[in-house]
């Protein structure tokens, strides 16, 4: 996925979730909290040469897989896990992929790839799930900054 495709994908995802701008998303909110706790601004949607998706006709080596947030001074990657990472969501899972599997299955494969590969390069992966916070019936975070920063501190500093 090139930068244009990535932005288009995020726009579709955000529209499906009723989010006007990416900066309004739960992912952005949680990463903002991580920035504060870690005292560093994350490189958002960062890619590494060694972390790649499955090969396709247009990219035989596989496209670089983005991570939600990378903190180079701490060598930490934070991945925010929305509900589509743990359950089937028709909007997200409707497309087939270059790998010949559904999007939900590909997401599981790529999530596991991050878990396997990042530590091999000395990068600590921290996964933060929406379920760590108070959330509504749509599994969106019910935001309470004071409470939420404590959740993020507990997860990042363990």
Tell me the role of every PLM-derived stretch.
Residues 1-158:
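Nucleic-acid endo/exonuclease domains
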């Amino acid at each position: 996925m090139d930068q244009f495709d990535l932005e288009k994908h995020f726009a579709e995802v955000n529209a499906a979730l009723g989010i006007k701008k990416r900066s309004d998303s739960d992912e952005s909110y949680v990463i903002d909290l991580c920035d504060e706790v870690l005292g560093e601004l994350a490189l958002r949607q960062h890619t590494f040469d060694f972390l790649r998706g499955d090969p396709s006709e247009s990219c035989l080596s596989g496209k670089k897989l983005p991570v939600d947030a990378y903190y180079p001074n701490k060598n930490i990657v934070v991945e925010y896990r929305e509900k589509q990472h743990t359950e089937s969501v028709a909007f997200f899972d409707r497309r087939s992929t270059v790998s010949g599997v559904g999007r939900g299955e590909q997401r599981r494969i790529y999530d596991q790839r991050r878990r396997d590969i990042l530590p091999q390069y000395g990068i600590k992966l921290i996964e933060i799930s929406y379920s760590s916070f108070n959330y509504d019936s749509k599994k969106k975070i019910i935001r309470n900054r004071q409470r939420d920063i404590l959740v993020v501190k507990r997860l990042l500093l363990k």
